Amino acid sequence: MLVFDAHLDISMNATEWNRDLTRPLEEIRNREALMLDKLDRGKGILTFEEMRKGEIGICIATQIGRYVALDNDLPGWHSPEIAWAQTQAQLAWYRTMEEAGQMVQITNRKQLNSHVELWQNNPADDLPIGYVLSLEGADSIITPAYLERAYAYGLRAIGPAHYGPGRYSPGTGSEGGLEPSARELLEEMQRLGI
């Protein structure tokens, strides 16, 4: 069987929570047992080993970098440029996992079909996890011109809104419609096929 997970904040778990997802789950939980910096420390459920056990061979893997304005008390980055840099750190982690054979990026139908065939015809024990790169909230897209760069590195999906106020669109817990800057963002997304 092959399971497709439609949303995993996998790079955030690694780069912001400092979780080595190549290690066993119990080891990660034990290492976090006395940590108090984040609400759900010691309760992680995701590792590459656990994904393979569950036959999760493909996922939508996110990048996330929320910008927060001065009047916003949510956690996030204090400028779109810092948020962009955070997403680039997450991208670097994905690339490192690719080099280690843990993951493989899927950017087109041919790669998808090949990866599905690999997982259907081999034991999952050591297979790479396929991922389609997504951006959760568009706050880190400094200007819509950055989308072309993002598409070139493999970004294939964007949810313009996430949680709270956003640069392009309000998210969960916020009211309002698309910001004026969202029109150009959406047009560029459509042009690129994101």
Q: What is each model feature region?
A:
Residues 186-194:
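Substrate-binding cleft of carbohydrate-active enzyme catalytic domains
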Residues 1-180, 184:
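N-terminal hydrophobic targeting/anchoring segments and the immediately downstream early-domain regions
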